[in-house]
Amino acid sequence: MQPHQGITGSEQTIPHRLFTDVLHRAIRRIVEGEGAHPAAAPSVRVINLSIGVPTRALTRRMSAVGRLLDWLAHSYNLLFVVSAGNHTDAFTIPVYGAHDIDNARLAAKRTRFETSLLRGILPPGDALNALTVGATHADGLGGITVPDTAWDLTPPGDPALYGAVGPGVGRSVKPDIHHSGGRALYTRPIVSPGQSEVAVSLARTATTGPGLQVAAPGRGGATNRTVFTHGTSNAAALVTREASRLFDILDSDARDPEDMPLPDPQYHPLLVRAFLVHASSWDTWDSSFRNELHLNDQDARRQLTALLGYGRLSPSRLGEAATNR
């Protein structure tokens, strides 16, 4: 990737280079090496990718880079943790929802559901063999004072409004799981007489928060600058950390002598993915989304699975189990 020549703060792939070839070569150099050069990191088993091609949201057919990830995951026995992608364009809500925060939250959630076909998974998050991660409206900043010009439209811990939604190819479960992506605020619209809808867009909160605090380029070469961000990339990075911890647990083989032996290391990437999914759940999302979106019992599970995947990851459930399991 390199800085975008026309959009400040954005990145683009190298011109005149096919991205799938660049990615294939990079992974091959990690695992196998290239030419006279040995493998750069042959012990690597989990790889985090947060790219999100905004012009290629999933509709029906898997992207070329998604197919490449499926092949790489199978051929090299790797776990790819991939961000679902962000849809940061403004959206509209009915004008009646702009009068108070409760109505605005409900209107935003319904709009997110009704426009889900336009907010599909971004490549390479459409890969079947990858663990695709969505974002929740959560971070560690604590209580904040929301200015009068902004709205906090998402209930704490709910799926973020900016996150891409499923389903995946062939109605597969995508995103697989959700994790903390950082809270995002939205600009409070000004309602004019005669309007039936108002536009709501993301507020700029990089300096003041909320969001996840991350390192950022500093002026004059300074190395201590941080900003607040939100996105599925943040969530994917946190899930990658949990995946690495699970690999360490499996490699340590720290079990009681009377326990069954752990599976062979060749199955560890698949096991780690299963553990992450198993430690996720809908929890209260099931009832709240059914009620607020007025879903009927016949279609609710299918529709909610497209929005929620397997649910929100609970890190406290990872690497542990009850004594009878």
Annotated model-derived regions:
Residues 1-61, 268:
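Subtilisin-like peptidase catalytic core
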Residues 48-50, 80-85, 133:
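Active-site neighborhood of phospho(di)ester-bond hydrolases with catalytic His/Asp-centered motifs
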Residues 52-54, 85-89, 136-139, 183:
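Catalytic metal-binding/acid-base residues of hydrolase active sites
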